[in-house]
Amino acid sequence: MKVKEQLFSLNAYVPGKNIEEVKREYGLSKIVKLASNENPFGCSKRVKEALALLNEQYALYPDGAAFELRQKVANHLKVQPEQLLFGSGLDEVIQMISRALLHKGTNVVMARPTFSQYRHHAIIEGAEVREVPLKDGIHDLDAMLEQVDYNTRIVWVCNPNNPTGTYVEKQKLLSFLENVPKSSLVIMDEAYYEYAGAEDYPQTLPLLEKYENLMVLRTFSKAYGLAAFRIGYAVGYAELIKKLEVARLPFNTSTVAQVVASVAIDDQSFLQECVKKNAEGLEQYYQFCKEYDVFYYPSQTNFIFLKIGLPGNEVFERLMKKGYIVRSGAPFGLLDGIRITVGLKEENAEIIALLANLVKEHVKKEETYS
């Protein structure tokens, strides 16, 4: 059976190790998973209440148009319902967009490193991938603009960026949008939008009225704590969204996912409490980094990327043996760093203590050999 040649250059997505797998491998009873940027505080109590009361006819297909959720999200964002495209997580939204816009002879422009699925789906569709290295951990929009040409169909801007947690400032983005050809779609992946609190972080939704070639992606998987339900969405120019709907699988978001997302978006007080606690958790890591002279990127997300002076894979393995799962920077091409999801206060303190011991051990070893 022949498949697309480009599939041979790709690997299936490999998520971080799960809790049960690590328990079995290392014979541990307690595992703290801080690898996948999930919300450690879970989801709103209203979601749990809604699930308990859910009495749907499960033999029936879900609402393919996600009408009720569409109205809820549109009202919350102050956009029109027809500007929304829903998917089974942002992974599917990215797949839909790539499938609709890309083919051999087209290209996409993106940062390196950034979220891997942009590149993955571009290659599947036969498009050329033009990757521009980050500059001081941030998207280099000027260099990215130089890579845009007549055949550029998509420019991906992950803001805040995964895996660095950094962001593109408002004025730099506005200048970029003014210069990108109208034939190229600029997609702002704002999966971590709710955590971004910087004063000059761009508010992109109002810009949709001016830039028809702008699209914004958001998700319920991160700050809303609904990763298990797989639901994300795109916001864009209504005419383009209408065309993209053709690439959407029928009934792609489940009845349960639509219900819990509709309930979650109403509980903004829970969301803000999560954001507040996340900021406090980040501060724990900042204090550790400053005390031990550890490099880190200031984060606008629920994770932090840092370098303690050891290879990322080594730190990953040593922490995992202690029952703490983080993400090595190696899969992103950042061999000397790790990405850690901000956890509960006590979880942060525990992993910081382990990191401090690794730093001390490394410093002592270097002094021995010097």
Swiss-Prot record:
Q: What class of enzyme is it?
A: transferase
The pathway is: Amino-acid biosynthesis; L-histidine biosynthesis; L-histidine from 5-phospho-alpha-D-ribose 1-diphosphate: step 7/9
Q: What is the lineage of its organism?
A: Bacteria, Bacillati, Bacillota, Bacilli, Bacillales
> Which species is listed as the source?
Bacillus cytotoxicus (strain DSM 22905 / CIP 110041 / 391-98 / NVH 391-98)
**Name this polypeptide is given:** Histidinol-phosphate aminotransferase
Tell me the protein family, please.
Belongs to the class-II pyridoxal-phosphate-dependent aminotransferase family. Histidinol-phosphate aminotransferase subfamily.
Task: List the catalytic activities from the record.
Answer: L-histidinol phosphate + 2-oxoglutarate = 3-(imidazol-4-yl)-2-oxopropyl phosphate + L-glutamate
Q: Which InterPro entries match?
A: Aminotrans_II_pyridoxalP_BS (IPR001917), Aminotransferase_I/II_large (IPR004839), HisP_aminotrans (IPR005861), HistidinolP_aminotransfase (IPR050106), PyrdxlP-dep_Trfase (IPR015424), PyrdxlP-dep_Trfase_major (IPR015421), PyrdxlP-dep_Trfase_small (IPR015422)
Could you name the domain of life of the organism this protein comes from? Bacteria
